[in-house]
Amino acid sequence: MILMHDITRDGNPVLRQVAKPLTFPLADEYKELADEMMQYLINSQDPKIAEKHQLRAGVGLAAPQVGKSIQMAALLVPNDKGEIIFKEVFVNPKIISESVRKACLAEGEGCLSVDKDIEGYVPRPDKLKIHYYTVDGEEKTIRLKDYPAIVASHEIDHLNGHLFYDRINKQNPFDLAEDTIVIS
């Protein structure tokens, strides 16, 4: 079971590396890691389990965040009612197209690997088309928009050595392009 002490923190070089692609069939250790990463997200979104194990809630977890520089990320995205609207483990994901229009979260973003609050809007594409493989090696292409697209972009950034605050405007953290969608 992944706990908060297992989460790699900002400053660790693994978070700034471009993660290595995986080959199929996946080794058992990577399948187990995928299961553990998804289970962390499930547990962290359950108030009783999260409190018992002092877990910070998460909607995504990339392998570099648990010290593994591999192209794998788990996503468990709820809607505003707490119902899961997207659940998947990406292996070797690639963004193959993205919208010109940007979106951001009204409250900004956080990250399990970043312990301090960093204020500012994090503009990301409002829509993404992503090519990836499942843990079983099934090839998929999906389209995401709004909140799920933001979460996917955040996790894929981790696989490319980027953290959310890299996208914040350093001179004016709350400056946005006119047509940016602000999601509350």
UniProtKB/Swiss-Prot annotation:
Enzyme Commission number: 3.5.1.88
Keywords: Hydrolase, Iron, Metal-binding, Protein biosynthesis
Cofactors required: Fe(2+)
Catalyses which reaction(s): N-terminal N-formyl-L-methionyl-[peptide] + H2O = N-terminal L-methionyl-[peptide] + formate
Pfam family, one: Pep_deformylase
Transmembrane stretches, start-end: none
GO molecular function, one term: metal ion binding
Keyword Protein biosynthesis tagged: yes
Active site: 155
Cell division found in the keyword field: no
GO BP of this protein: co-translational protein modification; translation
Cofactor mode of binding and number, as noted: Binds 1 Fe(2+) ion.
PANTHER family: PEPTIDE DEFORMYLASE, PEPTIDE DEFORMYLASE 2
Function: Removes the formyl group from the N-terminal Met of newly synthesized proteins. Requires at least a dipeptide for an efficient rate of reaction. N-terminal L-methionine is a prerequisite for activity but the enzyme has broad specificity at other positions.
NCBIfam families: pept_deformyl
Family to which the UniProt record says this protein belongs: Belongs to the polypeptide deformylase family.
Protein known as: Peptide deformylase
Gene label: def
